[in-house]
């Protein structure tokens, strides 16, 4: 077999960000009712987003039919691409035909962990030796989903360079920054800005802003006019179905995490 580089395709080791859909109950009726309640008011919000079904929060004796959960997600236009499970769950989790994935979230969910938001950032598993993945977005080495939860990692001393975007972002556009992200134009409805570090928006934010996407709980979002579809830090998010109070809506604000809750505070610029 020739090792000459093909002009038609490449196979490279890599990673890709997606969302975790964390299953916290084996009661499918309750799960279905909550999905409908959460998304019926905003059916287009997560439309066509891909997710990994995370079953690590289930008790040892609990099992869920993953085909049924995949169908529920399809009903709200989310596409399941795999399953994140503890090693002892692999036998039944693999029965649905979805690939087993590894997660890179620093605080691996467990049935005994404190309650978290049901959607977090996740990643597909790194390829085994001798194999290659079809994803091509470079990222840090993935954490083993089966390993015990680690203590929160200290802040990284040397982050990637700040990315500056000096143009407006229209609906459907997405920007991803490995470090901090600075946006000098409006982020329109339907646009999305994502950063592993902080996000600074010196214009109206009307789309989605996700900071600290790889589990950086110290990340913050700053903007001069807050009118968002969604704001998120380290996977903990808030959407338009939870209206913002008048003292921050349309105002200059900073957004940070405090004890796993999003804190939205006015910025005093004068």
Curated annotation (Swiss-Prot):
Pfam families: MinC_C, MinC_N. Keywords: Cell cycle, Cell division, Septation. InterPro entries: CAP/MinC_C, MinC, MinC_C_sf, MinC_N, Septum_form_inhib_MinC_C. It comes from the Bacteria. One of its GO terms (biological process) is division septum assembly. Residues 116-129 have a biased composition (Low complexity). Residues 105-129 are annotated as: Disordered. Gene3D superfamilies: 2.160.20.70, 3.30.70.260. Interacts with MinD and FtsZ. Belongs to the MinC family. Cell division inhibitor that blocks the formation of polar Z ring septums. Rapidly oscillates between the poles of the cell to destabilize FtsZ filaments that have formed before they mature into polar Z rings. Prevents FtsZ polymerization. This is Probable septum site-determining protein MinC. It comes from Burkholderia pseudomallei (strain K96243).
């Amino acid at each position: 077999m020739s090792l000459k580089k093909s002009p038609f395709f490449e196979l490279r080791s890599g990673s890709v960000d997606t969302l975790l859909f964390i299953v916290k109950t084996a009661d499918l009726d309750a799960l279905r009712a909550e999905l409908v309640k959460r998304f019926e008011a905003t059916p287009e919000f997560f439309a066509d987003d891909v997710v990994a079904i995370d079953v690590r929060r289930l008790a040892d004796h609990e099992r869920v039919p993953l085909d049924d959960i995949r169908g529920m997600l399809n009903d709200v236009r989310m596409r399941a691409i795999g399953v994140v499970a503890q090693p002892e769950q692999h036998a039944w989790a693999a029965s649905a035909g979805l690939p087993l994935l590894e997660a890179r979230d620093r605080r691996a969910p467990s049935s005994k962990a404190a309650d978290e938001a049901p959607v977090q950032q996740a990643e597909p598993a790194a390829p085994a030796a001798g194999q290659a993945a079809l994803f091509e977005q470079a990222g840090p080495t993935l954490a083993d989903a089966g390993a015990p939860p680690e203590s929160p990692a200290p802040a990284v001393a040397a982050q990637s360079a700040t990315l500056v975007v000096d143009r407006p972002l229209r609906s459907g556009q997405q920007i991803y920054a490995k470090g901090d992200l600075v946006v000098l134009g409006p982020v329109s409805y339907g646009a999305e800005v994502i950063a592993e570090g902080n996000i600074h928006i010196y214009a109206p934010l009307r789309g989605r802003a996700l900071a600290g996407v790889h589990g950086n709980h110290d990340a913050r979002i700053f903007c001069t006019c807050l009118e968002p579809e969604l704001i998120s830090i380290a996977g903990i998010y808030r959407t338009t179905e939870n209206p913002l109070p008048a003292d921050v809506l349309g105002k200059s604000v900073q957004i940070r995490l405090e004890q796993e809750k999003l804190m939205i505070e006015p910025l005093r610029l004068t």
